[in-house]
């Protein structure tokens, strides 16, 4: 089972990815994790990436694809894998295709921007414990304070509306075109093309997961 999840920030990809890797016993392949592991091991690609990162540059798509190919040779990928945060751009998607790294399913978790903003901007954190609340979906007993300690809750900078809107802009300009790319490729009927599905990201975690599993196992 070789999978990719697409969707904006806050669409629930991370939650669903955790459930999927447990169900299908496949690893979650993250470019960040791969970079850190390659640098720690001192592999040639890792050393190349380290030099670029230390000079403040962006690691090239060639290096990223090389790391992906290395990672997929590991025995834990024999049953498949789930890509996390990769590819991010059309250039990376084309490079993945050229490298003959095949996917079985690409699933878009679709959530409206305003719903995403409400989800993320409503989060409140009790910093010392890490307890998370939501002003609408999971409010504290008393507004603005932790249920257990009575200490104030904070809103992280990453959860502020202005920051979320900027992240959504980046998503729509760079990553959202992947939806069209994989949709159009699937419509060609090519044997190499993964199956493409769009599901609603609105509902309970369990409902969304059940919808994904139905798609994968039908």
UniProtKB/Swiss-Prot annotation:
PROSITE patterns: ADENYLATE_KINASE. GO terms for molecular function: adenylate kinase activity; ATP binding. Residues 122-159 are annotated as: LID. It catalyses: AMP + ATP = 2 ADP. SUPFAM superfamilies: P-loop containing nucleoside triphosphate hydrolases. PANTHER family: NUCLEOTIDE KINASE (PTHR23359). Monomer. NCBIfam families: adk (TIGR01351), PRK00279.1-1 (NF001379), PRK00279.1-2 (NF001380), PRK00279.1-3 (NF001381), PRK14527.1 (NF011100). This is Adenylate kinase. The gene is adk.
């Amino acid at each position: 089972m070789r999978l990719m999840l697409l969707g904006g920030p806050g669409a629930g990809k991370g939650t669903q990815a955790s459930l999927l890797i447990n169900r299908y016993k496949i690893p979650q392949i993250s470019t960040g994790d791969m970079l850190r592991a390659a640098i720690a091991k001192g592999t040639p690609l890792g050393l190349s990436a380290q030099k670029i990162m230390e000079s403040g540059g962006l690691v090239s798509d060639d290096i990223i694809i090389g790391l992906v190919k290395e990672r997929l040779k590991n025995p834990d990928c024999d049953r498949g894998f789930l890509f996390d945060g990769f590819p991010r751009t059309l250039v990376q998607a084309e490079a993945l295709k050229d490298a003959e790294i095949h996917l079985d399913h690409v699933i878009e978790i679709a959530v409206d921007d305003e719903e995403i903003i409400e989800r993320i901007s409503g989060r409140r954190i009790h910093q010392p414990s890490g307890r998370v609340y939501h002003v609408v979906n999971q409010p504290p007993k008393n507004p603005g304070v932790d249920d257990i300690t009575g200490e104030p809750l904070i809103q992280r900078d990453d959860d502020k509306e202005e920051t979320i809107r900027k992240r959504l802009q980046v998503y729509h300009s760079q990553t959202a075109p992947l939806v069209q790319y994989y949709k159009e490729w699937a419509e060609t009927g090519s044997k190499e093309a993964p199956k493409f599905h769009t599901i609603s990201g609105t509902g309970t975690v369990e409902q969304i997961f059940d919808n994904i599993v139905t798609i994968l196992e039908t």
